[in-house]
């Protein structure tokens, strides 16, 4: 039996401490809590304080005063009935007990890193990396199972583990609706959007828009927007979530740990390209599933299964909560996904309609996701990968959301803290500490070895997400921005530029760490979803109309995109200027911020973009047949339109063919003129000219 599961009476016989000594042992931060608990149940509090004193004394004798082995003493009594007191840590304000990793945990971590490096290096040798397609699209030779695993691993980063569990602890299961909407969106990608992308022979999403609408305004705008989202939103969220585990569980300097992770991640991203990313994602998907399912089993066992969770969640209140305040109370609709359309945190019309547009953007037009599907060897394997990812999308409700709710039941004084001052002491965030729910479970209830496995899971989620961002951002920069600067760049130059850009991303990520630390939200997942609702719907509408309406043209798409993004940026700035007040504060924000839910605003942005794009397209010249053929759903089977070519070389005047070489390009002819006394292919003597 573990030490924290011993009966309180045994502890009292062993410790020989009086009630008053136990109270004093609790320390000044707990004096008010001790007094309240003593008034309610002196006997229970007496035994708890004795247990507290013994745990501290035992830990002090082992580690010289460091509480490196503390665990919640009340886990063994969680199933004793509704009248059981909430579980109490040795220090209710200590969110992360300072325990050191044991040999088993370190062994698991070392084996994990060695295995990941071995798989990454193996994939660099196995796959072709000397061509642009081989590096950025894995040679188009991936089978369905690594594609599906990579889709899931790219989507489920450390931000999901921390964010979904935190939102589950704070508000219940409704946040899982994002996962269920994504389940359908990934299928829409494979069956509707992907056939269009394959028919159009595109590598990146800005490239599709360039072919579909022509011009450079839309592709360039979206390429910059995508890089902005990747660098300052995705990386920042994943790094913040991963930093919670790295800094607290490994007790390493944040910059040192982050730099090491980014260096390993960039190593096999730079050397191996997309193939290395997909194979390592497949490995890390297995690790994530095994670790998360294991923690789920421990979590449900601690509260008596799903039935115990439904009973105890509504009584999981912080002991320091004011009785006259509604702050910190669990939501009455915590176990409902579809909630009130006006007063709830996630209204059901917003879930069905407002949530759909950001989801379609992410799964059907985001470079990170689409690039993995384009790497499949054919459309059938791409569909198989999407089906696999769709099945896996059912699991986050049980692997992340519900364990977060369990964490609130087990640790209400920390996860469900309601007083801003107490929350500041617990997690450094006066808005709330729900985001520590998942790390709390890992560090408190798992035994040696499994704790190391779960840390490896979080590292796997962080690295898989970062590799996806690094590779896809490198692809966009190289193929859509660098190609515009140097249209005649060789494949070798494009490969070098892509790898150098990954290094710049690594440097930018490290420099962004202070911003991550200073931008904590009360609910990380909801915070990032609100930003997505302000920036992504206009882009999704442009892609949807471009794929399904042949009349849509460049002017309509550009102005629809500009108006949508402008309104979204205004709302985003208003959210920063007027942040959501704490529960105990009066809400004095403008009505457009306070009363219009971000999911409803997503619907407004979609409607505005749709109307502007349709009106401008009807009022201007329709697109040419070349911009429609094989680039919409209805024209994807059209014959390939051959561009007009110049006259063949054999029809050139003999005098020109005798002077060097001639190459036809469109309506022009490029000549390499070589003096008679020099070798014909000597580049130092060639002169280029163009006949129009």
Please name every model-derived segment.
Residues 16-17, 24-25, 38-39, 73:
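Intrinsically disordered, low-complexity polyampholyte segments enriched for Lys and acidic residues
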Residues 38-43, 56, 62, 69-71:
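Basic polycationic patches enriched in arginine
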Residues 4-7, 19-21, 35:
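Low-complexity, intrinsically disordered or signal/transmembrane-proximal segments
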Residues 27, 40-42, 48:
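N-terminal leader/targeting signatures
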Residues 2, 49-54, 69-692:
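Membrane-embedded helix-loop-helix hairpins and adjacent transmembrane boundary segments
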């Amino acid at each position: 039996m573990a030490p924290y599961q011993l009966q309180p009476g045994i502890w009292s016989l062993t410790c020989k401490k009086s009630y008053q000594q136990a109270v004093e042992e609790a320390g000044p931060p707990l004096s008010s809590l001790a007094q309240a608990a003593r008034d309610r149940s002196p006997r229970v509090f007496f035994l708890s304080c004795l247990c507290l004193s013994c745990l501290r004394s035992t830990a002090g004798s082992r580690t010289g005063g460091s509480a490196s082995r503390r665990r919640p003493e009340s886990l063994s009594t969680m199933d004793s009935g509704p009248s059981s007191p909430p579980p109490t840590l040795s220090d209710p304000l200590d969110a992360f007990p300072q325990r050191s990793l044991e040999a088993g945990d370190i062994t698991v971590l070392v084996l994990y890193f060695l295995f990941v490096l071995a798989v990454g290096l193996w994939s660099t040798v196995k796959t072709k990396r000397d061509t642009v397609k081989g590096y950025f699209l894995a040679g188009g030779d991936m089978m369905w199972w690594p594609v599906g695993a990579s889709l899931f691993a790219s989507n489920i980063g450390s931000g999901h583990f921390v964010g979904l569990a935190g939102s589950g602890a704070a508000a219940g299961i409704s946040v899982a609706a994002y996962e269920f909407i994504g389940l359908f969106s990934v299928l829409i990608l494979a069956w509707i959007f992907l056939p269009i992308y394959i028919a159009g022979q595109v590598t990146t999403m800005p490239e599709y828009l360039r072919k579909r609408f022509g011009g450079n305004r839309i592709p360039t705008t979206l390429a910059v927007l995508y890089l902005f989202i990747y660098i300052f939103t995705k990386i920042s969220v994943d790094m913040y979530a991963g930093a919670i585990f790295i800094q607290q569980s490994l007790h390493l300097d944040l910059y040192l740990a982050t730099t090491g992770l980014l260096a390993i991640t960039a190593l096999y991203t730079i050397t191996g390209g997309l193939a290395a990313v997909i194979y390592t994602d497949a490995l890390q998907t297995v690790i994530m599933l095994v670790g998360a399912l294991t923690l789920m089993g421990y979590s449900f066992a601690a509260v008596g299964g799903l039935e115990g969770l439904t009973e105890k969640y509504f009584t999981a209140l912080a002991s320091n909560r004011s009785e006259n305040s509604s702050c910190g109370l669990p939501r009455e609709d915590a176990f409902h996904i579809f909630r009130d359309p006006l007063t709830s945190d996630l209204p059901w019309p917003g879930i069905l309609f407002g949530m759909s547009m950001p989801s379609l953007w992410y799964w059907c037009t985001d470079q990170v996701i689409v690039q993995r599907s384009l790497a499949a060897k054919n459309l059938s394997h791409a569909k198989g990968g999407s089906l696999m990812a769709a099945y896996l999308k059912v699991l986050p409700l049980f692997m992340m959301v519900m364990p977060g709710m369990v964490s609130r039941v087990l640790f209400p004084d920390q996860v469900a803290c309601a007083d801003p001052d107490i929350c500041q002491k617990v997690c450094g965030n006066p808005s709330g500490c729900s985001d520590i729910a998942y790390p709390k479970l890992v560090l408190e209830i798992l035994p040696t070895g499994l704790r190391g496995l779960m840390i490896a899971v979080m590292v796997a989620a962080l690295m898989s997400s970062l590799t996806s961002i690094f590779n896809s951002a490198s692809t966009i920069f190289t193929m859509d921005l660098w190609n515009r600067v140097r249209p005649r760049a060789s494949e070798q130059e494009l490969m070098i530029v892509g790898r150098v850009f990954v290094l710049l991303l690594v440097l930018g990520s490290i420099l962004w760490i202070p911003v991550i630390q200073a931008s904590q939200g009360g609910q990380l997942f909801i915070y990032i979803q609100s930003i997505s609702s302000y920036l992504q719907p206009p882009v999704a509408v442009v892609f949807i109309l471009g794929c399904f309406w042949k009349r849509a043209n460049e002017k309509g798409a550009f102005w629809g995109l500009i108006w949508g993004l402008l309104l979204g940026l205004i709302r985003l700035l208003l959210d920063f200027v007027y942040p959501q007040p704490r529960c105990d504060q009066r809400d004095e924000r403008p009505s457009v911020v306070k009363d219009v839910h971000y999911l409803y605003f997503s619907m407004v942005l979609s409607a505005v973009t749709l109307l502007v794009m349709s009106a401008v397209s009807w009022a201007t010249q329709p697109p040419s047949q070349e911009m429609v053929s094989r680039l919409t759903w209805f024209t994807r089977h059209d014959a390939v339109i051959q561009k007009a070519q110049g006259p063949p070389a054999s029809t050139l005047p003999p005098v020109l063919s005798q002077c060097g070489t001639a190459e036809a390009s469109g309506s022009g002819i490029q000549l390499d003129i070589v003096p008679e006394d020099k070798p014909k292919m000597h580049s130092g003597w060639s002169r280029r000219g163009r006949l129009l």
